[in-house]
């Protein structure tokens, strides 16, 4: 793939030029306070390289899923503040995405300045299914950069989206990949292009339907496929076990039966489950055998015996990819499974495995549970994007840069 890189743009020279950077700054907030700044930190190397080279940087990003511009809880104001602190310079926030204020502020930028546009998803054209509407917003964003602008794609968490600020704008300006996207593609390729064996994949999360494509794509290629989290109950049901009130996708039972029959030597399911009476942090709970979940109880975490088995299967692996927690880690009583799996992967990494934490909830989980990023080979910033790449899908936001 012939994609131009940020290093190429810096070589061409950016002093005095407006550069639009699409970053992924979609950080978790609680009462307008950022609880995990990981994605902001991951975007800094690209922004800093541009400001230090004298570019006038305009950052486009989204936060959450706002219904309208009046949805002020999704304003990027806390992100502008966090960027200002981390860059040690004032980062202005435009009050709109591509309107009058954005233009005025973009025109007023000096070399090395940074402007953050308001949440691009405040503009319904960003995610429009109508190509012409997206193109229109993309043209307005490109216009912010004037006559000699450039576009840098550095939001790995959104490159699987065909959206105006990710895909369409890349066709309007000279386009480059930023340091983060370059690093993500390089690291994830170690799981897709001839990975070292034994290769183990751990999949958690709630729905089989969300991960079915990945499971089908990976099962023939991997040596071990560990399945936990909410989606394991549909697999347990497919084995003929009762699952009580646990999360269950009836429509996926036959798919799970087929997978279990074809890959019985590779698929590893929990042997014990921590069950609770209700989906609540303080609910009554106990550990039961995977085939012993009674009515009135729901599976909320992976049991200690299962985690021990998972660890044994991961021991000696050369490549490990993990996406999705294996329990309700947000509740302390049900975080042990996810923590235990993270410990097993960290241990395997210490012993020479190349490990990737595939973004999204898994990345938040390992950080919230106190693991240093260095405990793993790579923590991806993109949940959906990393899964689609692992599955072998084309990422529109990357493919569009290949010119």
Curated annotation (Swiss-Prot):
It is found in: Cytoplasm. Pathway: Carbohydrate degradation; glycolysis; pyruvate from D-glyceraldehyde 3-phosphate: step 2/5. It comes from the Bacteria. It holds the Pfam family PGK. Substrate binds at residues 24-26, 39, 62-65, 121, 161. Its main location: cytoplasm. Keywords: ATP-binding, Cytoplasm, Glycolysis, Kinase, Nucleotide-binding, Transferase. Monomer. This is Phosphoglycerate kinase. HAMAP family: Phosphoglyc_kinase. GO terms for cellular component: cytosol. PANTHER family: PHOSPHOGLYCERATE KINASE, PHOSPHOGLYCERATE KINASE 1, CHLOROPLASTIC-RELATED. GO terms for molecular function: ADP binding; ATP binding; phosphoglycerate kinase activity. It comes from Corynebacterium kroppenstedtii (strain DSM 44385 / JCM 11950 / CIP 105744 / CCUG 35717). Gene3D superfamilies: Phosphoglycerate kinase, N-terminal domain. It catalyses: (2R)-3-phosphoglycerate + ATP = (2R)-3-phospho-glyceroyl phosphate + ADP. The lineage of its organism: Bacteria, Bacillati, Actinomycetota, Actinomycetes, Mycobacteriales. Belongs to the phosphoglycerate kinase family.
């Amino acid at each position: 793939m012939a994609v131009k890189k940020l290093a190429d743009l810096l070589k061409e020279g950016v002093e005095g030029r407006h550069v639009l950077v699409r970053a992924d700054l979609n950080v978790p907030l609680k009462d307008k306070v950022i609880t995990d700044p990981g994605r902001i930190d991951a975007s800094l190397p690209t922004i800093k390289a541009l400001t230090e080279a004298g570019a006038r940087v305009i950052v486009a990003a989204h936060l959450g899923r706002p219904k309208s511009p009046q949805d002020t809880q999704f304003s990027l104001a806390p992100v502008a503040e966090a960027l200002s602190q981390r860059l040690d310079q004032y980062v202005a926030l435009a009050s709109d995405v591509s309107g009058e204020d954005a233009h005025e502020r973009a025109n007023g930028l000096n070399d090395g300045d940074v402007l953050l546009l308001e949440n691009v998803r405040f503009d319904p054209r960003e995610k429009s299914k109508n190509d012409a509407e997206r193109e229109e917003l993309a043209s307005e964003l490109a216009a912010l950069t004037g006559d000699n602008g450039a576009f840098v794609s550095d939001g790995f968490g959104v490159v699987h989206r065909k959206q105006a600020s990710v895909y369409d704008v890349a066709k309007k300006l000279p386009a480059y990949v930023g340091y983060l996207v370059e690093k993500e593609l390089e690291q994830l390729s170690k799981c897709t292009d001839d990975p070292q064996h034994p290769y183990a994949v751990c999949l958690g999360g709630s729905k089989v339907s969300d991960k079915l494509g990945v499971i089908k794509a990976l099962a023939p290629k991997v040596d071990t496929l560990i399945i936990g989290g909410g989606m394991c109950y549909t697999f347990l049901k497919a084995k003929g076990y009762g699952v009580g009130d646990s999360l269950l996708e009836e429509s996926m039972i036959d798919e799970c039966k087929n997978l279990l029959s074809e890959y019985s030597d590779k698929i590893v399911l929990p042997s014990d489950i921590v069950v609770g009476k209700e989906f609540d942090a303080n609910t009554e709970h106990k550990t039961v055998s995977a085939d012993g979940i009674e009515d009135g109880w729901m599976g909320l975490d992976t049991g200690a015996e299962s985690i021990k088995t998972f660890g044994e299967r991961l021991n000696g692996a050369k490549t490990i990819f993990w996406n999705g927690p294996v329990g309700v880690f947000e509740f302390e009583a049900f975080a042990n499974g996810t923590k235990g799996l993270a410990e097993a992967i960290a241990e395997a990494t210490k012993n020479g495995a190349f490990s990737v934490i595939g973004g999204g909830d898994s990345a938040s989980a390992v950080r919230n549970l106190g693991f240093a990023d260095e405990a793993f080979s790579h923590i991806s910033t993109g949940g959906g994007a990393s899964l689609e790449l692992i599955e072998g899908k084309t990422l529109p936001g990357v493919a569009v840069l290949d010119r």
